Regions:
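Short beta-strand "wing" residues that participate in macromolecule-binding interfaces
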Residues: 68-69, 200, 468
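Conserved core of the PLP fold type I
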Residues: 161-314, 325-343, 414, 494, ...
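Hydrophobic residues in well-ordered beta-strands that form the structural core
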Residues: 231, 252, 318-320, 394, ...
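PLP-dependent aminotransferase class I/II
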Residues: 345-427, 434-438
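AMP-binding (ANL) adenylation modules
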Residues: 474-479
């Protein structure tokens, strides 16, 4: 393993410390052309940092031409001649064999069994929570996911909508469609947005396969390896996966939750945003202003205005994830960043996944017309268009008023479940435990007393039939071991109360063990399966 060291207490970001040490080792000859450096996951484990931190360092070094990832082989130090050449050349011709600056290894002759792992691009990508903690496994009470309550899906109404679409459109709806999106759905979305105070033209709206695809399209349209984006920290793991897979540097800025005596308004730390924009060439800032995932924090209006001012001054785009915005239980809905935008710098992404049916995979993106045109071309190259039948069904469902009725009902259901969670936490969690109290969304962020490890707690909670999501999966930079997320939307009040009761009992037992000297901290980097 490389002789690298990082200092967590330093004012220098961890990824910069790693980058600078590797760069120095190249210049001093400690690392020579052709040397293989550790995979990002391997080095992160060795240094005790998040894999994204190492990925950010590697992305910068790759953009400088000092290292190069190679399909099936790993990441290597480039020689000086290769570093001076544009990516995609090998100094002799423009052929694809030299596209990554290496002479391809000859094919290995084996026993006839193909080793698929040798063909993978590399080891990028975190294991999804849904794979590590399958929903309802062994009858467990799963507080892992932030997903809708399927027992309240209006199946009969949805079935009627599908039948109406097939009767009206026949086989035409099963043909290829427009990359822009199904026009009747776009009209319904524009009408819905208009009722919420946001005026949008058809040319400013692109139908996608959900927020995850919207992020992927933005990544492909705007970002190159080594480019930087600002993310909330902690954040939605899917966004990190999109960007780290593309070798984009993720700059995490802390999110204030109002717990642990934090000063300042809730939401992303604006001083941290300003510092990131001042010290880096950032392409865009990604934020979830309403009930941020995983913390449940909501940005006040004044903070939203200030974020837009910062972005405009630094000429940086803002990507606004509104996936939870319609799930407010109480009070008035706050204006979106897009509504407050006076400089045409906001790209808004949204989806039916939290407000209706996640399995249909339909979302949308709102942006300036020239941005939408670019995204449309990228989408066309990616998947041609979003599922036509799903779009048409949702258009009919919305036209009939089904979406409004469903939302009204689900806000009430989720409010009751959130209240049940608040009461259960207050009743069963030991002193010193804190949690957020969102007025909307689907999740709550819990902070254990200092010194306790949520991953250790999960091992024992799982044995008792309760699952939750440790905070380490959500961090861009150094994970905090004593935090975790609880998703409440998909469980009824009885199971929520029972799950938290078990969780509280497990935590109290761990506290008693600690007092007796039997408590043991686990390595929070170990995947729990």
């Amino acid at each position: 393993m490389l002789p690298l060291q990082v200092q967590a207490e330093s004012h220098v970001p961890l990824y910069v410390q790693i980058r600078d040490q590797l760069r120095a080792m190249v210049h001093t000859g400690e690392l020579r052309p052709g040397d293989r450096i550790p995979a990002s996951r391997e080095l992160a484990h060795s240094l005790g940092v998040h894999r994204t931190t190492v990925a950010n360092a590697y992305a910068e070094l790759e953009s400088e031409g000092l290292i190069q990832g190679h399909v099936g082989r790993g990441t290597f130090i480039r020689n000086a001649a290769e570093a001076a050449l544009p990516h995609g050349t090998n100094g002799t011709n423009g052929g694809s064999n030299g596209a990554r600056g290496f002479t391809p290894a000859p094919p290995t002759i084996g026993n006839g069994t193909l080793r698929w792992e040798s063909l993978f691009a590399d080891e990028r990508g975190e294991e999804a929570l849904s794979r590590i903690y399958p929903e309802g496994a062994n009858g467990a009470i799963s507080l892992v996911a932030a997903r809708p309550a399927e027992e309240h899906f209006p199946l009969e109404e949805l079935r009627s909508c599908v039948q109406a679409v097939l009767k009206t459109s026949g086989g035409e709806i099963l043909q290829l469609g427009s990359s822009d999106g199904y026009e009747p759905l776009k009209r319904e979305l524009i009408a819905q947005l208009g009722k919420e105070g946001l005026r949008v033209k058809s040319e400013q709206l692109l139908v996608t396969a959900g927020v995850q695809q919207s992020l992927d399209l933005l990544c492909k349209a705007f970002l190159r390896p080594g480019d930087a984006v600002v993310l909330e920290d902690p954040t939605y793991p899917g966004s990190m996966t999109v960007f780290t897979t593309a070798r984009v540097r993720c700059l995490g800025v802390p999110v204030r939750t109002g717990t642990n005596g934090q000063a300042g308004p809730a939401g992303i730390d604006l001083e941290g945003v300003e510092a990131a924009l001042t010290q880096n060439r950032v392409k865009f800032v990604l934020v979830t202003p309403d009930w941020q995932n995983p913390t449940g924090a909501t940005m006040p209006v004044e903070s939203r205005r200030r974020l837009l001012e910062l972005a405009a001054r630094h000429q940086v785009a803002v990507v606004e994830d509104c996936i939870y915005s319609r799930l407010r239980f109480t009070g008035q809905r706050l204006p979106s960043l897009r509504q407050l935008d006076r400089n045409n710098i906001v790209i808004q992404i949204d989806s039916f996944s939290k407000i209706a049916f996640p399995g249909l995979r339909v979302g949308w993106c709102i942006a300036p017309e020239n941005v939408i045109e670019r995204l449309r071309l990228v989408k066309q190259a990616t998947d041609l268009h979003t599922d036509q039948l799903a779009q048409a069904t949702l258009a009919e469902f919305t036209r009939r008023g089904g979406l409004d009725r469903h939302l009204k009902k689900m806000r009430r259901v989720y409010a009751e479940r959130a209240e049940a969670l608040m009461k259960a936490l207050a009743k069963h969690m030991p002193e010193g435990t804190e949690w957020t109290r969102p007025e909307g969304g689907m999740c709550v962020w819990v902070t254990l007393p200092a010194g306790y490890d949520a991953s250790e707690l999960l091992i024992h909670a799982r044995e008792k039939g309760v699952l939750f999501a440790p905070g380490r999966y959500f961090y861009v930079q150094a994970p905090k071991p004593n935090v975790f997320r609880l998703g409440f939307a998909s469980l009824d009040e009885k199971r929520i109360a029972r799950g938290v009761e078990i969780l509280g009992n497990v935590l109290r037992e761990e506290m008693r063990k600690r007092e007796r000297g039997g408590w043991r901290r686990s390595d929070s980097r170990v995947a729990l399966v």
